Amino acid sequence: MGFRMVLATSASVTALGLTGALLPTAPSASAATAPTVSDVRFGSFNLSSVSFDNAAAGDHRPWLKRRPVVVSQILGQKLDVLGVQEANQSKIYARSVNLGINQYTDLRNALNVAGGHYALTNEHAYNCVKPASTYKCVYRNQGASQDNRILYNTATVTMLSQGSVKYRTQTAGKNARYFEWAKFKVKATGKRFFFSNTHLDPYSAATRRGEWDEVIANTNRLHGSLPVISVGDYNTSKFAGYAARYLPKMKRAGYGDVLNQQYAQTVVKTPRAERVTRGWINSYNAFRRDVRHYSYASARHKVGNGIDWIFATNSLRVKEWSVVTNVDLTTLRVQGVLPSDHNLVRATLVL
């Protein structure tokens, strides 16, 4: 689940007196934003682990109740590459899935049963000689990355290579955190790109800072001359103190936020994305149906305080960025089953 301490509501931020310039409006589709063969659609989605099913209550429904909405949103957004977090890798929750041996294979298969054409960059659950479990594990690097996984649309992109790196910086006694990466080629154009996915530690700001440094170091080491798209749950809102350092550091490294958000500013003064959809809603919802608790519902020119990010090579054109949620804009309540305690975030880039 997401890091509660970084969740900022519009009320709390208003109390700080923080203001900014206007966001770009969300115009109707035009020649400038209409889909082209060069468009590639990316996303990041923290699924909320199936391991939490035993605690599911109220609007936090079990995985099998949430999965149809997850599938519908992913397919509806026509994503080419998606980074997912909390897609549990263990077989011990077999009773909570029915289309795979664990949560990420269950999701992959559910997407394809519904008409998708998705594959995982790596299906190995663990870095063991026998990678299906950790029982009597003999270490072997299988490229596994715990519950952090990359899905890609085989109809639109081809995977060229993939791997993962376990961060040196970890919080003792907690789940290991990984940097997961892959290189792809767009079938329609032949363009290649580097994609990474991560879920930074939720327990320690010091650990997150160390892991973020490793995101940059690993990206710089691995991407070569390819454009970069880096997504994930960074457990960091733009109001976290260290965001003042790391948001500019990502941009200086060559791959800034696709919205061009700045530390502690509620509105983007120099927009990068040409179109923003539901940008006033936070990416973390805590399984709450009323979006007024985690958005700027009364000031929709502002950007929500998300902890899920999409970074991309600074020179790439960003056609659109969106928070995906089934919110009724009249009642400000999410309709139907909430798919996760996070909202899917996605961006359309031109390669």
Question: Predicted segment positions?
Answer:
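Active-site-proximal beta-strand elements of phosphoester/diester hydrolases
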Residues: 37-57, 148, 161-165, 181-183, ...
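Structured beta-strand-rich core segments of catalytic domains in phosphoester-bond hydrolases
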Residues: 88-192
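Metal-dependent phosphoester-hydrolase catalytic domains
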Residues: 220-227, 236-351
